Amino acid sequence: MRIIALLAAILLVALQVRAGPLQARGDEAPGQEQRGPEDQDISISFAWDKSSALQVSGSTRGMVCSCRLVFCRRTELRVGNCLIGGVSFTYCCTRVD
């Protein structure tokens, strides 16, 4: 599992380096300001079904969550997806006692 976590970290760094600075898109308003490299952030979106949402009770308070490449660990619950650099990862949480 440590190897998978290390490979995931290397993949994320490689994606960030490859992405470079944000480019202005044709669908943006002409007067819209372009963000510099220091203003870039990672967008994480969550999408889960009702059964997962009920298990989490609408919050991840008291839980430790992380984005995994494919599968959650045996002690974790799959809550949704993380979208990092255009790549979808599995969002997994485990309860903290």
From Swiss-Prot:
Disulfide bonds join C65-C93, C67-C82, C72-C92. Changing L69A: Slight decrease in antibacterial activity against E.coli. It is found in: Secreted; Cytoplasmic vesicle, Secretory vesicle. Its main location: secreted. PANTHER family: ALPHA-DEFENSIN 1 (PTHR11876), DEFENSIN ALPHA 4 (PTHR11876:SF23). Belongs to the alpha-defensin family. This is Defensin alpha 4. It comes from Homo sapiens (Human).
